[in-house]
C-alpha cells in the first residue's frame, strides 16, 4: 500500500484541484474592476452664472500632450439644448503635477466678447512646426453650429477664435496636425467635422487660415471621426458610419480616397437614459512607428449582446486593419458594461513594446436602469502594443447616479468621448466626476489623477487570444439617431444612403 501523499494519482488530483482553484480565482478577480489606489485631482470648475446653463457642470474632455505640457479641453456649464456656456481648458506644464484652468476668450457671449450663445465638442492638438496649441470647437448661435479654432503659444493664454466653417450645420469636429519632421506635409493641420457628410479642411500656417472643406471620394457620411497622421504624411480618418470605417489622404489633404470598412459594429444600449452608452464612437492613437490603434465599445463577444466590451483594431498602413480583439478588462462572463473609451498611446514607444492606456466609464451591472445604474471610471493599460492588458481598475470616482448629471437632448450627460495622453512616458486621463447636487446646483467637474495610470511590473496581464466574435450577435437596438450639435450618430439626408 502506497501511503505517499505525493503519489502520481494523489499529486495529479491535487494539481487538478489547484488548477481549478487558480482558474476560479482569476475569473473572480476579473469579474469586476479592482479599486485602484489613486488620488483624484479636480482640475477645473464652472464659474459661470448665465441663466440658461446647468451650473457647476463640465462634460466631454479631450487631451493632448507635447513635451512636458498637457492640455485638456471640455464644455463648461452645460446647456440642455447643446454645448456649454463656454469651453474650458486645464493645462499642466510640469508633466501632470500641477494644473491651471481657464476659459476660451471671444468664443461665447459669456466670456470676453464672444458672440455665440454656447460652444461644444472641444478637441485639442499641438502643431510642432509652428509651436502653437489649437483647440477646435463648435460655436453655437441662432444661425446654426459652425467650426472654429482657438490658438495659444503656451497652452495657457488663448487668442480669439478663427472661423473654419460657417455653413451652420456642423457637428462632431476633431483636429490633428502632422508633427513628423520628415514628412512632406510637416506642419499641416487637419480639421474634421460632419454635416453629417464627413468634411475636412487643411491649414498650412499653424491654424491661422483654412482651406475649402473637402470630402472623401465617395462622399462618406458618418460621425465621431478622428484623423491621425502617419510618419510618411498619410492622413487616416476613422469614423462611425454604418460600421467602423476609414479613408485616407496621401497628398497633404488635397484629395481624399474612398471610405472602407474596418469592422462591423454591434453595441448594447441597455435600459438607462445616459447619453452615449450604446454609441461606439472610435477613440484612436498612433505610436512612434506610425502604427494606428482604434478602440470602441462593442457587444459582439457576448452572447445575445448582453453587455459591451472595449475592442481594439490596429493597422500599420491605414488601409488593412486587424480583426477586432476584445480588451480583456474582465472575464467574458462578467456583468460589467464598458463604454465611452479614451485611448492614449505613448508616441515615444512602438510596435510590440508600445504603451497604451484606455480610460472608460462602466456600469458594474449592465442590466440596470436610471434608478439603479451607477457610473464608475476605470482604466486598463498595455506595455506590449495591446497584446496583453491589465485587469480593469476602478479609479475611485465613486458610484455616480444618473440623476446627478446635467440634461442634454439625448439624455443625462458625461460625454460622447473621453481622452488619455502620455506626457514624458506617464499616462494621465481626464474624465468627469459627478457628486450629489448641493444647494440647487450640480456638482460635476473635470478630474485627473495625481499618480500616472500605470501598473506594477509584477501585475498580471491578460490576453483575449483565441476569443472570437459570436456569429449572429446584433445590437439590442439601432444606434441613437439625433440631429444637429447633439447628433450622436450618423444620419443621412432623405434619399442618401450612408456609405459603407
Sequence positions of predicted segments:
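N-terminal secretory signal peptides that target proteins for export/translocation
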Residues: 1-14
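Residue-level detector of alpha-helical hydrophobic segments embedded in or interacting with membranes
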Residues: 3, 27-28, 56
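Leucine-biased recognition of intrinsically disordered, low-complexity hydrophobic segments
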Residues: 6, 21-22, 498
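Hydrophobic alpha-helical segments, principally membrane-spanning helices and signal/leader peptides
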Residues: 12, 16-18, 79, 302
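Bacterial N-terminal signal peptides
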Residues: 18-29
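Sec/Tat signal peptide C-region and signal peptidase I cleavage site
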Residues: 30-36
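C-terminal PAP-associated
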Residues: 36-500
Amino acid at each position: 500500500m502506497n501511503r505517499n501523499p505525493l503519489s502520481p494519482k494523489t499529486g495529479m488530483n491535487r494539481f487538478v484541484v489547484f488548477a481549478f482553484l487558480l482558474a476560479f480565482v482569476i475569473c473572480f478577480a476579473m469579474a469586476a474592476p479592482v479599486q485602484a489606489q489613486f488620488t483624484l485631482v479636480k482640475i477645473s470648475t464652472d464659474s459661470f452664472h448665465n441663466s440658461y446653463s446647468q451650473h457647476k457642470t463640465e462634460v466631454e474632455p479631450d487631451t493632448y500632450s507635447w513635451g512636458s505640457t498637457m492640455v485638456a479641453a471640455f464644455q463648461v456649464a452645460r446647456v440642455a439644448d447643446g454645448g456649454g456656456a463656454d469651453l474650458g481648458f486645464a493645462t499642466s506644464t510640469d508633466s501632470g503635477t500641477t494644473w491651471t484652468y481657464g476659459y476660451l476668450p471671444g468664443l461665447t457671449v459669456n466670456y470676453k466678447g464672444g458672440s455665440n450663445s454656447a460652444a461644444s465638442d472641444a478637441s485639442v492638438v499641438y502643431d510642432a512646426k509652428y509651436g502653437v496649441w489649437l483647440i477646435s470647437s463648435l460655436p453655437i448661435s441662432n444661425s446654426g453650429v459652425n467650426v472654429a479654432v482657438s490658438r495659444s503659444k503656451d497652452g495657457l493664454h488663448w487668442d480669439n477664435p478663427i472661423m473654419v466653417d460657417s455653413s451652420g450645420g456642423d457637428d462632431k469636429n476633431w483636429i490633428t496636425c502632422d508633427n513628423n519632421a520628415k514628412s512632406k506635409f510637416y506642419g499641416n493641420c487637419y480639421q474634421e467635422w460632419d454635416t453629417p457628410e464627413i468634411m475636412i479642411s487643411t491649414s498650412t500656417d499653424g491654424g491661422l487660415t483654412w482651406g475649402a472643406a473637402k470630402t472623401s471620394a465617395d462622399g462618406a457620411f458618418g460621425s465621431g471621426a478622428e484623423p491621425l497622421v502617419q510618419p510618411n504624411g498619410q492622413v487616416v480618418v476613422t469614423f462611425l458610419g454604418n460600421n467602423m470605417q476609414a479613408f485616407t489622404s496621401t497628398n497633404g489633404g488635397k484629395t481624399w480616397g474612398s471610405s472602407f470598412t474596418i469592422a462591423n459594429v454591434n453595441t448594447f444600449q441597455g435600459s438607462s437614459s445616459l447619453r452615449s452608452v450604446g454609441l461606439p464612437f472610435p477613440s484612436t492613437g498612433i505610436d512612434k512607428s506610425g502604427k494606428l490603434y482604434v478602440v470602441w465599445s462593442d457587444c459582439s463577444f457576448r452572447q445575445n449582446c448582453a453587455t459591451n466590451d472595449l475592442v481594439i483594431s490596429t493597422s500599420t498602413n491605414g488601409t488593412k486593419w486587424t480583426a477586432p480583439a476584445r480588451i480583456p478588462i474582465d472575464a467574458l462572463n462578467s456583468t460589467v458594461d464598458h463604454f465611452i473609451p479614451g485611448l492614449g498611446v505613448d508616441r515615444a514607444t512602438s510596435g510590440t513594446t508600445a504603451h497604451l492606456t484606455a480610460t472608460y466609464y462602466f456600469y458594474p451591472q449592465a442590466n440596470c436602469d436610471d434608478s439603479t445604474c451607477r457610473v464608475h471610471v476605470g482604466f486598463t493599460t498595455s506595455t506590449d502594443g495591446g497584446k496583453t492588458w491589465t485587469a480593469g481598475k476602478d479609479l475611485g470616482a465613486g458610484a455616480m447616479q444618473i440623476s446627478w448629471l446635467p440634461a442634454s437632448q439625448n439624455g443625462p450627460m458625461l460625454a460622447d468621448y473621453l481622452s488619455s495622453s502620455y506626457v514624458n512616458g506617464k499616462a494621465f486621463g481626464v474624465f468627469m466626476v459627478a457628486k450629489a447636487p448641493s444647494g440647487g446646483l450640480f456638482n460635476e467637474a473635470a478630474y485627473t489623477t495625481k499618480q500616472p495610470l500605470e501598473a506594477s511590473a509584477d501585475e498580471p496581464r491578460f490576453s483575449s487570444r483565441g476569443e472570437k466574435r459570436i456569429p449572429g450577435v446584433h445590437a439590442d437596438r439601432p444606434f441613437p439617431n439625433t440631429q444637429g450639435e447633439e447628433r450622436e450618430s450618423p444620419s443621412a439626408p432623405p434619399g442618401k444612403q450612408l456609405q459603407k
